[in-house]
């Protein structure tokens, strides 16, 4: 059972359908070793078209405008009173010992940000631990001929996945962990003033953890605790690709490599054009010019921070 020094505030950003969040709340209430007095559940409703229903024992923050993941987390954190913050995506499945196991693992890392191992519904790794993004990592993902290597060790390394951390059997430090499930002391969160709200969706957790790194806060993957993330299995739509591209340009501008990123992605788009010209000789449905124009538009909108 948690002690009075281990109070927990769970923050769940919400936008969309309430049902998955209600299921998640039920799993939180069923956690072993955690008393209701030590567990605060906060739902941050990010101006959802379907408002989150009033729920007994749940604190609901109703935002006046939609601001995205980082803004919703900040609003929830402002309401939180626990010693630890646990930030959860709504589409997670948690084991009944999730909180107690994370607390046990983090006893040796009292000032760290941590994530459990995150897997998809198929049980496969979602490569939760990653290296801070570089121009090379982003260009690698942009270059069409390399898509065939995505599931390989080479592909994971090229995209910046931290293979050593993701395959470790004990807690392992890394640059950053994806934001589906993060646990961090509230005082640590407040030291860097939380998430940068310029990021609407994507990269906010990367920037947050880079600022934590600057003040010496460890970022840890706890592989002996596993959660299942439904959303990670979905394929990116064209709109999601724009969100990701724009977020990466905001991040690159903030951390000093926006011009290099723009040049690299533009050159890579023209390299893709050459590759697609060859593809179009065998497959007349491939339109190299259309693909090039689409990629250049993604870059143009990204540099203007447009979603």
Language-model regions: role of each:
Residues 85:
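Short aromatic/hydrophobic "clamp" motif used to bind/position activated sugar donors
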Residues 166-194, 198-226:
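A short, conserved alpha-helix in the catalytic core of glycosyltransferases
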Residues 63-80:
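Glycine-rich, basic loop-to-helix element that forms the pyrophosphate-binding segment
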Residues 17-31:
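Short, well-formed alpha-helical segments that are part of the catalytic scaffolds
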Residues 133-174:
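Short, flexible, basic/aromatic active-site loop/helix in glycosyltransferases
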Residues 239-249, 253-307:
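Non-catalytic, C-terminal membrane-associated alpha-helical segments of glycosyltransferases
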Residues 27, 34, 42-53, 65, ...:
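A conserved acidic beta->alpha catalytic loop
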Residues 96-131:
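Conserved donor NDP-sugar-binding/catalytic core segment of glycosyltransferases
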């Amino acid at each position: 059972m948690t002690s009075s020094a281990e109070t927990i505030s769970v923050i769940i950003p919400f936008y969309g359908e309430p049902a998955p969040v209600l299921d998640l709340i039920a799993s939180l209430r069923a956690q072993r070793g955690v008393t209701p007095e030590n567990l605060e559940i906060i739902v941050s409703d990010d101006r959802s078209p379907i408002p989150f229903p009033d729920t007994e024992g749940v604190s609901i923050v109703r935002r006046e405008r939609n601001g995205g993941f980082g803004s919703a987390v900040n609003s929830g954190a402002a309401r939180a009173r626990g010693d630890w913050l646990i930030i959860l995506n709504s589409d997670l499945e948690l084991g009944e010992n999730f909180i107690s196991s994370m607390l046990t693992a983090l006893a040796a890392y009292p000032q760290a940000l941590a994530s459990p191992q995150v897997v998809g519904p198929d049980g496969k790794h979602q490569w939760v631990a990653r290296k801070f993004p570089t121009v090379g990592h982003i260009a690698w993902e942009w270059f069409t001929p390399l898509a065939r290597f995505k599931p390989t060790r080479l592909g994971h390394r090229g995209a910046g996945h931290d293979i050593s951390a993701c395959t470790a059997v004990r807690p392992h430090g890394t640059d950053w962990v994806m934001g589906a499930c993060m646990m961090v002391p509230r005082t640590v969160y407040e030291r860097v003033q939380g998430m940068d709200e310029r990021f609407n969706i994507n990269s906010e957790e990367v920037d947050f953890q880079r600022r934590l790194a600057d003040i010496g806060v460890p970022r840890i993957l706890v592989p002996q605790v596993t959660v299942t993330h439904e959303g990670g299995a979905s394929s990116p739509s064209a709109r999601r690709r724009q969100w990701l591209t724009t977020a990466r340009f905001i991040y690159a501008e903030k951390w000093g490599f926006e011009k290099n990123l723009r040049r690299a992605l533009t050159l890579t788009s023209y390299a893709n054009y050459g590759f697609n010209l060859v593809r179009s000789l065998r497959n007349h449905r491939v339109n190299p010019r259309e693909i090039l124009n689409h990629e250049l538009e993604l870059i143009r909108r990204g540099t203007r921070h447009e979603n």
